[in-house]
Curated annotation (Swiss-Prot):
This is PDZ domain-containing protein GIPC1. Pfam families: GIPC1_GH1, GIPC1_GH2, PDZ. It comes from Rattus norvegicus (Rat). InterPro entries: GH2_GIPC, GIPC1-3_GH1, GIPC1/2/3, PDZ, PDZ_sf. The gene is Gipc1. Widely expressed. One of its GO terms (cellular component) is glutamatergic synapse. Residues 1-55, 221-244 are annotated as: Disordered. Residues 133-213 form the PDZ domain. The keyword Phosphoprotein applies. May be involved in G protein-linked signaling.
Length: 333
């Protein structure tokens, strides 16, 4: 069917200049949030978890980002299970874990743990710290935020655009979890739902954000960053294989993405940020996987509808994704 002829539900871009990040879910955790949204891949048939004896026995080292002894965790197949294992190792409630970074204790958004973990990656868990409420006057349509989520019900700030409305409010920082907007709880919401709410707030009015920042060690208390930058932090992990976490079905050990796939994923993630105000490398990876063998944009659109229909991607976005995958295939970077 030609693209755009009633093949799926239509929706305008959630965020035009504002950004929302593809959730860290990278695991497609398909739980409906308070706003009625649901995780990607919810329509797929669920597979029973494999017997424990058949799961790959992989042991990872972990620390709390603000400082702790080193723990060892194993036997998880998705982000929620991972957070549970970390909580057990450090005797914390699982709900205290906000997100994890790989190979750095810093709040580095380029090192967020998504749906893949290198076999020698070191996991740093960032837990809840100080809570704060901030009043924001929406003087412009775009607030300058990029939102992501952790795949387990928490949406947080991944990037703050320089010179934006939010950039002028020093109390708001990258890594802050968005608990509520004007008293409406966002716990359990996906990144794109939070981005939509922020976009729909009326211009020229004040709204209240309830935030929780990651707990900081003394050496981490400094001027806030506008977001991660490539190359920051030590590279502790050297394993070439990755453990891919899934919300349905077993975790699998896979090779790292090819150069083409890495570049295509990066470009699609940029498109997600531009169109929807979200960043989500795992969502981008899923889209590249769906599109790399398709012959035309219509086939890609049908595949996206079938697998990721809840996102209701606009036609122009699908065309740009098709173009990004095609450019990466022929080396046009």
């Amino acid at each position: 069917m030609p693209l755009g002829l009633g093949r799926r539900k239509k929706a305008p871009p959630l965020v035009e200049n504002e950004e929302a990040e593809p959730s860290r879910s990278g695991l497609g955790v398909g739980e409906p949030g308070p706003l009625g949204g649901s995780g990607a891949g919810e329509s797929q048939m669920g597979l029973p978890p494999p017997p424990a004896s058949l799961r790959p026995r992989l042991v990872f080292h972990t620390q709390l980002a603000h400082g702790s002894p080193t723990g060892r965790i194993e036997g998880f197949t998705n982000v929620k299970e991972l957070y549970g294992k970390i909580a057990e190792a450090f005797r914390l409630p699982a709900a205290e874990v906000m997100f994890c970074t790989l190979n750095t204790h810093k709040v580095d958004m380029d090192k967020l743990l998504g749906g893949q973990i290198g076999l020698e990656d070191f996991i740093f868990a960032h837990v809840k710290g100080q809570r704060k409420e901030v009043e924001v006057f929406k003087s412009e349509d775009a607030l300058g935020l990029t939102i992501t989520d952790n795949g387990a019900g928490y949406a947080f700030i991944k990037r703050i655009k320089e010179g934006s409305v939010i950039d002028h409010i020093q109390l708001i920082s990258v890594g802050d979890m968005i608990e509520a907007i004007n008293g409406q709880s966002l716990l359990g919401c996906r990144h794109y739902e939070v981005a939509r709410l922020l976009k729909e707030l009326p211009r020229g009015r004040t709204f209240t954000l309830k935030l929780t920042e990651p707990r900081k060690a003394f050496d981490m208390i400094s001027q806030r960053s506008s977001g991660g930058h490539p190359g920051s932090g030590p590279q502790l992990g050297t394993g070439r294989g990755t453990l891919r976490l899934r919300s349905r079905g077993p975790a699998t050990v896979e090779d790292l993405p090819s150069a083409f796939e890495e570049k295509a994923i990066e470009k699609v993630d940029d498109l997600l940020e531009s169109y929807m105000g979200i960043r989500d490398t795992e969502l981008a990876a899923t889209m590249v996987e769906l599109g790399k063998d398709k012959r035309n944009p219509d086939e890609l659109a049908e595949a996206l509808d079938e697998r990721l229909g809840d996102f209701a991607f606009p036609d122009e976005f699908v065309f740009d994704v098709w173009g990004a995958i095609g450019d990466a295939k022929v080396g046009r970077y």
